[in-house]
A protein has these predicted regions:
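Sec-dependent bacterial lipoprotein signal peptides
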Residues: 1-15
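Bacterial Sec-exported substrate-binding components of ABC uptake systems
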Residues: 17-98, 209-236, 360-373
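A short, structured surface patch at a secondary-structure boundary
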Residues: 54, 58, 63-149, 155-161
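Extracytoplasmic ligand-binding site segments that recognize negatively charged/polar headgroups
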Residues: 88, 96-98, 113-124, 164-167, ...
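Structural recognition of the beta-strand scaffold that forms the well-ordered cores
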Residues: 89-92, 109-113, 155-159, 179-182, ...
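Short helices/loops that flank or line small-molecule/ion binding pockets
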Residues: 142-153, 282-293
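Structured C-terminal subdomain patch of bacterial secreted/periplasmic proteins
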Residues: 187-205, 209-215, 296-373
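Alpha-helical, coiled-coil/dimerization segments enriched in small aliphatic residues
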Residues: 246-280
Length: 373
């Protein structure tokens, strides 16, 4: 899409991780030729450089993907982290990155996990750990450095939780393990979240696979884009143990999914400029006022766990008995696997569309929604 005039990055300091030990001839400077086209994602960019190099920028942090057989430019800005292909033995801490990597056939590049086997809802990831192909190397705040170093880890993929323990990031980098902090959860559009598959395609040399996977995902919901809104309203929520309702902000990707499915999110006007969180806790009284007349209730099981019956829901919040959706029997619970299955968001959109357009869809035919009876 957009193309930038070629220019050379200025030389500041030699990067600490510059490939001094690489035998291939080095180029002196990095020349940007174009901007890699992204249709939806806003939280990362990729500059395509001469010689097959790719310069990734995420929230001000820069990463240079160096093709196999090449070396990093000699005069490279000191803030740029070098990622030498093939990138192998990845320590994958951000669980939402696993599904895109699996979808492009890149699971073999992952050697270490920040999630234990029993906590994976992705069959391929769980099986790989059970078979010893991927080892548990500790969660983001307490990594097993010995395991990570013995595995010759080529990259740690973290999410922004790592900023709560910056000393861990610093220690990994001190040991020579580059750290990439992904921000897909900050994307406000479901298609933007899925487009992060292209970043993993670039890292793993599987760009064509990533583009094909993303295009297929977009095509799955393409028929809905020509449909008229259904007029149905919906709330997406959970009830906390301290009697608050957790709802998504109006600009969140879940609200966008409800819209793509033909519905209208009842808290579309809810904003909170005080933080970057996608969710906000509101009082049950405020939830009652905003969602009592919603046509559909969608209970988010990710945090508080799955519900199986209407009685379980009413036990958590008896006042829901007054809600229109409860009385009409249009209350649905998401599966707990939803967060990890980040490339399957089109299926949730299609599920929602069936709930909005059919009187009583068979939940055995839905992927992520189960009806509460």
């Amino acid at each position: 899409m957009r193309r930038a005039a070629a220019f050379a990055l200025p030389a500041l300091l030699l990067a600490g991780c510059a490939a001094a030990s690489q035998t291939p001839a080095q180029t002196d400077a990095l020349t940007i030729e174009s901007r890699y086209p992204l249709e939806y994602a806003k939280q990362f960019t990729v500059d395509v450089c001469a010689g097959g190099y790719d310069l990734i920028t995420i929230d001000g942090s820069r990463y240079l993907v160096v093709p196999e057989g090449a070396a990093a430019p000699a005069n490279l800005d000191a803030d740029i982290t070098v990622l030498q292909q093939p990138i192998q033995n990845i320590y994958l801490v951000s669980s939402s990155a696993m599904d895109p990597i699996i979808s492009i056939g890149g699971l073999g590049a992952v050697a270490l996990s920040g999630t234990q086997a029993e906590n994976w809802y992705l069959d391929a990831a769980r099986t790989a750990m059970e078979q010893g192909e991927i080892a548990y190397a500790g969660k983001y705040s307490a990594p097993d450095y010995e395991t990570i170093l013995s595995a010759d880890c080529g990259l740690a993929i973290e999410n922004t939780m790592i900023y709560h323990t910056p000393e861990v990031k610093e220690q990994l980098e001190k040991f020579g393990v580059p750290v990439l902090v992904e921000r897909s959860s900050y994307e406000s559009d479901p298609l933007a979240r899925m487009e992060w598959v292209k970043l993993y395609g670039i890292l793993l040399g599987r760009t064509e696979e990533a583009e094909r996977v993303f295009d297929d995902a977009v095509q799955r919901i393409a028929p809905l884009l020509d449909e008229e809104p259904t007029g149905k309203t919906a709330a997406f929520f959970s009830i906390t143990s301290n009697n608050l309702a957790t709802v998504r902000k109006g600009g969140d990707y879940v609200a966008k999914m409800i819209g793509l499915a033909g519905g209208s999110y009842v808290f579309a006007d809810l904003t909170d400029s005080g933080n970057n969180l996608a969710t906000v806790n509101i009082s049950l009284e405020d939830f009652y006022a905003g969602a009592r007349d919603a046509d559909v209730l969608l209970y988010n099981s990710t945090i508080e766990g799955e519900l199986r019956t209407m009685d379980e829901l009413l036990a958590k919040c008896p006042m829901l008995a007054d809600f229109k959706a409860v009385q009409s029997g249009s209350v649905w619970c998401t599966s707990q696997s939803l967060f990890q299955q980040s490339m399957e968001l089109p299926e949730l959109i299609l599920d929602m569309n069936r709930v909005f357009t059919e009187d009583d869809p068979d939940d055995s035919e839905l992927t992520f929604l189960t009806k509460l009876h």
